[in-house]
Amino acid sequence: MKNHAISNKYLDISPEVTEALENNRPVVALESTIIAHGMPYPQNVKTALQVEQKIRENGAVPATIAVINGMMKAGLSHEEIAFLARKGDEITKVSRRDLPFVIAAGKNGATTVASTMIIAAMAGIRIFATGGIGGVHRGAEQTFDISADLQELAKTSVAVVCAGAKSILDLGLTTEYLETHGVPLIGYQTHALPAFFCRTSPFSVNIRLDSPEQIAQAMAVKWDTGLQGGLVVANPIPEPYAMPEAEISAAIEQAVRESIEQRVNGKACTPFLLARVSELTGGNSLSSNIQLVLNNAELAAKIACCYWERHM
């Protein structure tokens, strides 16, 4: 069962990723919003390169995804990663709705979970590692602020390894939304939904799977049977780097209050909240964020190796 890249004049797949795909070697997609908007410089560029190295160490090829000069890129050079990291907020945050406009204007864009999934699927990449998915924001019953990531998971056939939804979100409503749209929520060696900085939450996953092989098999069966759409693989942050629930909850509640007072909304909301939580925790949340991304990259690479070995 081979996955071929879709021919697209706006898609540029790097030579390393092209060679891997043509030779049926495992590839793991990575997003770029975390580089431009999720972490400060220079931690962002250092982390991005560490994540790529972690994937290589575990037998797969990394494909960091972004829009560069109006081209969708699957596989970035170190120079391109450093460019996104330095420019930070000057880089447009790009989800599904934004892609055609950023491409048409020849601009640069940092891809969210949703747009990274889209470009990964075009390139023939089936698995993607990130920190946390977007979801239903707190207060969404008034604002209807729901991340486009959730709709993308319902229709684009890419598995996303994450530490759950970002803990700044309403985790209960996020799980309900995923259930409504038929998106499997897999807990890796856990029955409880991880809450990004914390290993557990009051909410449950749909199913617990304890090995990369089991997850790879579930991916293959889902898509072989014609069931389109993604899967969420929720991987708890390593215990030494997990944050106390009381500390992170207090910081999140304050950050959310401030976002409401300052009328921060839309695509600016998540970067604002993450940055403010980092400030309120004295940088502890940034350290935890880096470690959970590395942990997710390692698991994604192991799943990718199993998937390619058995099903490609």
UniProtKB/Swiss-Prot annotation:
InterPro entries: Indigdn_synthA-like (IPR022830), PsuG (IPR007342). Its EC number is 4.2.1.70. The active site is at E31, K166. It catalyses: D-ribose 5-phosphate + uracil = psi-UMP + H2O. Coiled coil: none annotated. Catalyzes the reversible cleavage of pseudouridine 5'-phosphate (PsiMP) to ribose 5-phosphate and uracil. Functions biologically in the cleavage direction, as part of a pseudouridine degradation pathway. Homotrimer. Keywords: Glycosidase, Hydrolase, Lyase, Manganese, Metal-binding. Substrate binds at K93, V113, S147, A148, D149. Binds 1 Mn(2+) ion per subunit. HAMAP family: PsiMP_glycosidase (MF_01876). Belongs to the pseudouridine-5'-phosphate glycosidase family. Pfam families: Indigoidine_A (PF04227). GO terms for molecular function: hydrolase activity, acting on glycosyl bonds; metal ion binding; pseudouridylate synthase activity. This is Pseudouridine-5'-phosphate glycosidase 2. One of its GO terms (cellular component) is cytoplasm. GO terms for biological process: nucleobase catabolic process. Mn(2+) binds at D145. Its cofactor is Mn(2+).
